[in-house]
């Protein structure tokens, strides 16, 4: 072990004696060449403090890594990345796509299965019309052109999770085409993409989900067919994305849109939505590549990364695959069209199989399912009933009615499938009714105050307890009454937080009753009491008082305010009044 460390040129401390690089032989020297040297202490000229030497080595290593990173980054700038996204989302329906079996996947394995789901001979598909409605809502929300006539096709492949040997999808004539999604800087797109990017959507198609497989090494694999024929929509974007961050932002935005219109069950975090990404690179300034995808020409050979289950995985996998392809091309290699995988925490993608083409899947129209005909009257009704889109909600929340910062508005929209936003609106409505007697300026700020309590104070308690969102834990009326008391200065901020935690822990008493019974209502101090308390704190810290007076260090007044709140009776000292008295006594 010692020989290998010496050979690598890296010093290690194996005993209390401090050895230096100069006291060791060169990497090429053998132990037998100078056996007595290891028994001699280093000379004063050779002696270097170990801590200093380690710092120098660490500094040199950081410098080397920085130079290498800058060199690699310069090389990366020579290449253009192109990404297309495919999203598979489970539709929120009670029945499966082509059978009457229920769609619940949390039941006992293989308990919600029809004969057609298992491909029993003679069983026929029965298209469940209710599955079309959430799919249409998603297509309308994504600005798609709904096709009056669409058809189903068979995509043939053989795998244990697909008992029929084919998947029913809409390859040739999908039900929706030519949509788009707009991404803004607040969506998290890359700075180099500017303030806004429009990503075109090629098509939306209905298709079956597959069985859920669970592997038990070395040779056992269990299959749960409850998920077979669960209705999916596949959203296919055009290959117009050129940065990993924007690709992740696109997936995030698409999820937010299909969730906001009630089309899907859950998002990525719960397994209801999966993303595949197609990645290719080409050198800038060179002749256009020879590949074309979805009508866009001049691209490099693409690879597909399957089943990405988080936004971070989307971004990280694209970065890793981009770097891999560049390294292959710069070393004179050729990119193969293939399907690759990505594991969380990994630094590189891995090959799964060669990439199949449409010929390999042997697409053919399904002869057992008639064409799907969609009337304009149905579309008109759905458009009228569609909820407000996320971008419109954001505009509303940051506008004059609510005046929220964008940092608060976005989480309210995105958290808990819209449940947090609904809760927030209820709190604001109740709070405004309680504060109807207040002036306009006070009432105008209520929405921002409420967002702080819903997101940060209540959200913090949920995070600390590792608890999922539940609107009943702290009823909207309780939170509104608590904020009302705080705004009227009937309680202090610390008291309000204490009461919120009490309600969160299960106290169901109405807020006014709780405050009265626990003696938490603010009993304001008189001016004389404030002065006496301030004088006692000042007397204990004469040096700090002198610094405030002579050096104008007004920031230290806040420290005195804190001392007054700590030493005074709990919940009775108001910070603004305490600071006012301190300024009078210290500054005159």
Swiss-Prot record:
GO terms under cellular component: glutamyl-tRNA(Gln) amidotransferase complex; mitochondrion
InterPro entries the record matches: Asn/Gln-tRNA_amidoTrfase_suB/E, Asn/Gln-tRNA_Trfase_suB/E_cat, Asn/Gln_amidotransferase, Asn/Gln_tRNA_amidoTrase-B-like, GatB, GatB_Yqey_C_2, Gln-tRNA_amidoTrfase_suB_CS, Gln_synth/guanido_kin_cat_dom
Database matches in NCBIfam families: gatB, PRK05477.1-2
Gene Ontology biological process terms in this record: glutaminyl-tRNAGln biosynthesis via transamidation; mitochondrial translation
Region Disordered, residue ranges: 22-50
Gene3D superfamilies: 1.10.10.410
Domain of life assignment: Eukaryota
Subunit structure and binding partners: Subunit of the heterotrimeric GatCAB amidotransferase (AdT) complex, composed of A, B and C subunits.
Pfam families xrefs: GatB_N, GatB_Yqey
Name of the protein: Glutamyl-tRNA(Gln) amidotransferase subunit B, mitochondrial
EC number: 6.3.5.-
Protein family membership: Belongs to the GatB/GatE family. GatB subfamily.
Keywords: ATP-binding, Ligase, Mitochondrion, Nucleotide-binding, Protein biosynthesis, Transit peptide
Enzyme class: ligase
Reactions the enzyme catalyzes: L-glutamyl-tRNA(Gln) + L-glutamine + ATP + H2O = L-glutaminyl-tRNA(Gln) + L-glutamate + ADP + phosphate + H(+)
Localization: Mitochondrion
Coiled coil: none
Principal localisation: mitochondrion
Purpose of the protein: Allows the formation of correctly charged Gln-tRNA(Gln) through the transamidation of misacylated Glu-tRNA(Gln) in the mitochondria. The reaction takes place in the presence of glutamine and ATP through an activated gamma-phospho-Glu-tRNA(Gln).
Keyword Ligase annotated: yes
Residues of the transit peptide: 1-109
GO molecular function: ATP binding; glutaminyl-tRNA synthase (glutamine-hydrolyzing) activity
Cross-referenced PROSITE patterns: GATB (PS01234)
């Amino acid at each position: 072990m010692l020989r290998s460390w010496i050979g690598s040129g890296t010093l290690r401390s194996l005993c209390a004696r401090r050895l230096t690089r100069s006291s060791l032989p060169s990497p090429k020297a053998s132990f037998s060449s100078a056996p007595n040297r290891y028994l001699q202490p280093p000379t004063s000229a050779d002696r270097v403090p170990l801590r200093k030497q380690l710092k120098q080595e660490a500094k040199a290593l950081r410098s080397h890594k920085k130079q290498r990173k800058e060199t690699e980054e310069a090389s990366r700038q020579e290449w253009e990345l192109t990404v297309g996204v495919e999203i598979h989302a489970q539709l929120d329906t009670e029945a499966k796509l082509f059978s009457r079996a229920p769609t619940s996947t949390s039941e006992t394995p293989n308990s919600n299965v029809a004969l057609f789901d298992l491909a029993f001979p003679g069983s026929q598909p029965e298209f469940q019309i209710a599955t079309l409605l959430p799919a249409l809502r998603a297509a309308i929300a994504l600005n798609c052109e709904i096709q009056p006539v669409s058809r189903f096709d068979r995509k043939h492949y053989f795998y244990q999770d697909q008992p029929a040997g084919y998947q029913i999808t809409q390859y040739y004539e999908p039900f929706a085409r030519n949509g788009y999604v707009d991404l803004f800087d607040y969506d998290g797109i890359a700075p180099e993409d500017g303030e806004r990017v429009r990503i075109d959507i090629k098509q939306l198609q209905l298709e079956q989900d597959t069985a859920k497989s669970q592997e038990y090494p070395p040779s056992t694999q269990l299959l749960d067919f409850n998920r077979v024929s669960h209705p999916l929509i596949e959203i296919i974007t055009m290959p117009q994305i050129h940065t990993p961050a924007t690709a992740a932002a696109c997936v995030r935005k698409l999820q937010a849109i299909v969730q906001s219109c009630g089309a899907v069950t859950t998002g990525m975090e719960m397994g209801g939505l999966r993303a595949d990404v197609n990645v290719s690179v080409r050198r800038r300034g060179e002749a256009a590549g020879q590949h074309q995808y979805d009508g866009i020409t001049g691209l490099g050979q693409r690879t597909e990364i399957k089943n990405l289950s988080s936004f971070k995985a989307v971004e990280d996998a694209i970065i890793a695959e981009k770097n891999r392809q560049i390294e292959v091309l710069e070393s004179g290699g050729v990119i193969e069209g293939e399907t690759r995988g990505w594991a969380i925490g990994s630094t590189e993608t891995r090959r799964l199989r060669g990439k199949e083409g449409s010929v390999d899947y042997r697409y053919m129209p399904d002869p057992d399912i008639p064409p799907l005909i969609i009337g304009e009257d149905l579309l008109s009704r759905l458009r009228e009933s569609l909820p407000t889109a996320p971008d419109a909600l954001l505009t509303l929340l940051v506008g004059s009615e609510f005046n929220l910062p964008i940092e608060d508005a976005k989480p309210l929209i995105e958290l808990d499938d819209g449940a947090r936003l609904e809760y927030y609106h209820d709190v604001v409505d109740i709070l405004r009714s309680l504060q109807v007697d207040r002036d306009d300026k006070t009432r105008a700020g209520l929405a921002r105050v409420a967002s702080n309590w819903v997101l940060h104070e209540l959200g913090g308690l949920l995070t600390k307890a590792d608890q999922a969102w539940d609107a009943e834990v702290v009823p909207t009326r309780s939170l509104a009454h608590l904020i009302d008391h705080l705004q009227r200065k009937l309680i202090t901020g610390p008291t309000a937080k204490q009461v919120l935690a009490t309600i969160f822990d299960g106290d169901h008493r109405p807020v006014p009753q709780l405050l009265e019974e626990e003696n938490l209502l603010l009993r304001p101090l008189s001016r004389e009491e404030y002065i006496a308390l301030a004088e006692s704190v000042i007397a204990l810290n004469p040096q700090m008082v002198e610094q405030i007076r002579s050096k104008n260090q007004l920031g230290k007044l806040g420290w005195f305010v804190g001392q007054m709140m700590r030493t005074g009776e709990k919940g009775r000292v108001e910070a603004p009044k305490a600071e006012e008295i301190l300024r009078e006594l210290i500054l005159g």
